[in-house]
Swiss-Prot record:
Residue ranges that the Swiss-Prot or TrEMBL entry lists as coiled coil: 330-388
Cellular localisation: Endoplasmic reticulum membrane
The protein, known as: Glucose-signaling factor 2
Membrane topology, from the record: Single-pass type II membrane protein
Keywords in alphabetical order: Coiled coil, Endoplasmic reticulum, Glycoprotein, Membrane, Signal-anchor, Transmembrane, Transmembrane helix
Organism: Saccharomyces cerevisiae (strain ATCC 204508 / S288c) (Baker's yeast)
Source lineage: Eukaryota, Fungi, Dikarya, Ascomycota, Saccharomycotina
Amino acid sequence: MEIYIRLNADVEHDYAFQVSNEDTINNKIKKIFPSKTGLADLMVLRPSIFHEKEPVKFYKSIHPGYLSEGGCLMFHYEADNEENLEELNDSKPLIDQLWPGQLVVPEWKLSKKNIWVYTIIMLAWLYTDLPDAISPTPGICLTNQLSRLLIPVAKHMDLPEIAAKLEQEVQANYSSLVAQWLFFVMHIFKVGIITLFLKLGIANPISFNPYKLWSLRDLTSPSANGAKNSGGNNNTTDLKTRLRSLGWIGAKRATYDDYQTNYYNYVIDKMGGAVAAYRAGAIRKAAAPGIQLVAGEGFQSPLEDRFTASTFTAIKTERKFILSEEYFVELENNLKKILEEYDGDIGKMNAEIRRFRRFGIYEPDEKLASLVKLRREIADEKEKASNNDATFGIKKNDLKKSN
């Protein structure tokens, strides 16, 4: 079974992982995050440097999600909101807790150690740039330290004017009081920008240790791995073997916006251009594909009914889209039919599988297409009824005012 795990607490980093019937949080998912045996030293997993490297808890998203035009499920942007999360049992098999394709959301704890270290470094840096007029140790800023290193170099290269200029600049109170305060304010602003980038995870390095980053090159190099393993080094594990043992697939689930853009371009190309698509009446659906599911549908379907419920019956009798084993078998059959059309072309088949994992199916068979059509009709009926109720309420209020 394939599931998705949200890394970096980022909606754009929902990665697919393969799990077996016996896999649990303890014996599978938690192994993804340690430094030496997992992926923490190979790629950034945590939201920012201010978080611990390993999550403290794991949740599943029970937001119903979106039903795509191909009959697949996409994650909603509110999938990781607190009200849409349910904690997973660490020792219970994942297959008994999750639907195929469901989203697992790790909970990350702030690292007090990292926060304190960063704060001390930034405060020390700010201290060195205090205006000379108020600093207990004027003239110790990093710029002055660099200038002091360049003075003997300038003298050695017989550049007395430059050396003299540098010697003047390193003197305390060389700049005017206004300039000193202006530079200090700019320095505070610079520290604020750096902190913002790190907090938001825009800058989120694996490590600040250059040696550690350099040593990772050996692990990510297939030739280096082969050489070290053949030499009997048990501390170095082949990267592909490690990824395979963790269930890593390497595919990311698309956000709804990515899906919408990709599906729109697909429809336009298929129709032979925007004009042809407009004439065929396909533009409206391509511009806003899919249907947002409601409570009790999608990933909120009762998991205990997985092997007894019928998705295609419930859409007609209960007027809602529920998940079932029948539905996932139909998805698998659809994908197999699509792959058969490539006549054994491995490249095209792999590309289609990657697209399926990222965007779902684009050309469903009649059974899946009918399912989506019925669910869209239900959504349209609800929207029409809601609009009628709103119109009736407005007219009722107008009648009261006239009386």
